[in-house]
């Protein structure tokens, strides 16, 4: 089996906290130097690399003299603010040894949920790559609470892979890859060398929490691979403790777990909608509407809506739930939540008589709808 990285030109590399810190005691400058050297070697092979790096909070904790990760959000944000300075400085210094310029980009999921900001971020990243710069990306933990509390850079790496239409996402961790079971508890557990991204069984295999320094577990990596597949990006989950891991993957050596994107690449607009981690609201649809969306490729009409949840405006991304509460699709709504409540369960021909106007006959047009 050959590594998919060998034939990939545009890469997103995510390194976890444990691979760039001294077990939480600040940044490991030597380790970061090795990552810079490996990425420099990839660039000499003609590959473009975007680096998603954790480590800001761990560095901030060290600079502030804290030995335990704080629980209070404001203290986490303070640690991130202090640590981000050091993280940027070390990467700039180490990459400069290879005559490579770096750029710091701090993102939140909200940045990528807004269409205009999404396109601006994409344009900036592609320009940096064209200029030969290595973008260093991290979540903007200083201003966002949800990302610190629940988020992870595995997901961010997948979103960035989709943003720049990367060929592959490499998630480097302190584990060898995905096992069929927890190898610490099951001696019969074996490494999953290759599988299709999004296979339901993979989520059942994944489990366990991250360390006290980082936040990501194996499940987040499996879900990140599923998300990266939206843009056709393959994912490799491998141990960053392996010597020269990036060079070996680029040479074709199969290391860790390869998760292959088998589904067709989504159109850019639908990919953006699918990547929303949070939607503004939900509509519950009947079984007939579910069938028309999932099997017939039809638009969602008001008559198929049986319930409205949350507050949303026209043009926002909303989720479509079946009777069991499972999301089956999402898309851009033509009507607000208040308007939808008035026209639900009604045929499109009655919209104007109910509202006094009709913007569109569909609640969500099929061109603005994506199955999930």
Curated annotation (Swiss-Prot):
UniProt superkingdom: Bacteria
Catalytic activity: L-glutamate + ATP = L-glutamyl 5-phosphate + ADP
Residue ranges constituting the PUA domain according to the UniProt record: 280-358
Disulfide bridge map: none
Entry annotated with the keyword DNA repair: no
Pfam family, one: AA_kinase
Binding site for ATP: 14, 173-174
Pathway it works in: Amino-acid biosynthesis; L-proline biosynthesis; L-glutamate 5-semialdehyde from L-glutamate: step 1/2
Job of this protein: Catalyzes the transfer of a phosphate group to glutamate to form L-glutamate 5-phosphate.
Protein name stated in the entry: Glutamate 5-kinase
Organism field: Paraburkholderia phymatum (strain DSM 17167 / CIP 108236 / LMG 21445 / STM815)
Gene expressing this chain: proB
